[in-house]
């Protein structure tokens, strides 16, 4: 069992090495839009999971997730060799690639928040012209305040303790 801090440092280094190799050394066109977002290494330092995202060629085009996964699987051996040569550890971790779903979840949450904001704006527009169904203050009785203040003056004037 290795130190968790060492596993984190190793994961960061593996992420950097693999990202650099994908960008500059591996010439597979399926990996052109692949970005390594995170890496996790098990505490025994034998397995590394690399999380990746894929960018589409344009904003309207859906990314090719299957092609990127196939390209990463094909390049896995070369990438592991590069990681082993760069790290200088006794055992080079096996590499596994997993698609990072955080950006997709973030887009879905942004869409839900935009929908909620639009609903709030619609409700605010409806409220601006709205009036209460009944009177402005249905519990207020006109004239009741005058009677209550008159009763208080009468009670204050006749104090039987002073006599």
Curated annotation (Swiss-Prot):
GO terms of molecular function: ribosomal small subunit binding
Protein family according to the UniProt entry: Belongs to the RbfA family.
Compartment list: Cytoplasm
InterPro entries: KH_dom-like_a/b (IPR015946), RbfA (IPR000238), RbfA_dom_sf (IPR023799), Ribosome-bd_factorA_CS (IPR020053)
Cellular component aspect of the GO annotation: cytosol
Annotated region described as Disordered, given as residue ranges: 124-163
SUPFAM superfamilies the UniProt entry points to: Ribosome-binding factor A, RbfA (SSF89919)
PANTHER family the UniProt entry points to: RIBOSOME-BINDING FACTOR A, CHLOROPLASTIC-RELATED (PTHR33515:SF1)
Assembly and interaction partners: Monomer. Binds 30S ribosomal subunits, but not 50S ribosomal subunits or 70S ribosomes.
Function as written in the Swiss-Prot or TrEMBL entry: One of several proteins that assist in the late maturation steps of the functional core of the 30S ribosomal subunit. Associates with free 30S ribosomal subunits (but not with 30S subunits that are part of 70S ribosomes or polysomes). Required for efficient processing of 16S rRNA. May interact with the 5'-terminal helix region of 16S rRNA.
Species of provenance: Mycolicibacterium vanbaalenii (strain DSM 7251 / JCM 13017 / BCRC 16820 / KCTC 9966 / NRRL B-24157 / PYR-1) (Mycobacterium vanbaalenii)
Keyword match Cytoplasm: yes
Record keywords: Cytoplasm, Ribosome biogenesis
One GO process term, biological-process aspect: maturation of SSU-rRNA
Protein origin, superkingdom: Bacteria
Main subcellular location of this protein, as a coarse class: cytoplasm
Protein name: Ribosome-binding factor A
Acidic residues bias: start-end ranges: 144-163
NCBIfam families listed in its UniProt record: rbfA (TIGR00082)
């Amino acid at each position: 069992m290795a130190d968790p801090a060492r596993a984190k440092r190793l994961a960061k280094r593996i992420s950097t090495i693999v990202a650099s190799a994908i960008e500059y050394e591996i010439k597979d066109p399926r990996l052109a839009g692949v970005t390594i977002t995170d890496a996790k290494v098990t505490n025994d330092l034998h397995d590394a999971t690399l999380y990746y995202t894929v960018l589409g060629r344009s904003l309207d085009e859906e990314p090719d997730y299957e092609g990127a996964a196939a390209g990463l699987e094909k390049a896995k051996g070369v990438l592991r060799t590069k990681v082993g040569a760069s790290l200088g550890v006794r055992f080079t971790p096996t590499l596994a690639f997993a698609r990072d779903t955080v950006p997709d979840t973030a887009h879905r949450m942004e869409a839900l928040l935009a929908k909620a904001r639009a609903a709030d704006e619609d409700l605010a527009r409806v409220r601006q012209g709205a009036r209460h169904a009944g009177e402005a203050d249905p519990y207020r009785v006109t004239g009741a305040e005058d009677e209550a203040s008159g009763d208080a003056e009468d009670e204050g004037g006749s104090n039987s303790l002073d006599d």
